[in-house]
Amino acid sequence: NKTSEIEDGLGAILGFDFKIKEKGNDREKLSLSLGQVFNYELNRDIPSKSSLDQKMSDVVGKINYNFSKIGNIGYKFLLDNNLDDLNYNEVSTELNFGPVQFNLDYLEENKHVGLEHYASSGISLNFNDQNKLSFSTKRNFKTDSTELYNLSYQYEIDCLTAGVVYRREFYQDSELEPN
């Protein structure tokens, strides 16, 4: 049935995964993945946001590095098939220092992928196994504004989780102009 087909024609996928594990255990220390799709013809049935409609898709990549026991950092990207433009950048990191956890995320989308560009961060404090206090925020670089603040308290036992969340969201009204 031709109407249910999304992909047809000749194509190939080229990619690799590389991993390094810690000595003495099976924990992944470093991982690297890279890939690209090659098609014999253009395929207009696939959305252009993915670049899979082109003869050569964007180069997709992902790198993860795990620090000893304190955290990790990851990087995901889309490199345009001309190898000149980064259409997607995402960096995320987590750090764990016992009862305190930090996270920081950065995202930038360009061209056919999207228009997002922001950083978000958070901190959590675990008082004990049942009580947790968290704060997070998100900064939008396109609008040069803070989008939200989140402050939460969570209490958790066996099969019950209760919490209180204060969330302050900021928005931009296109009809309002600053003084």
Kindly give the residue locations of the regions a language model identified.
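Outer-membrane beta-barrel translocator/pore domains, especially the C-terminal barrels
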Residues: 1-154, 158-179
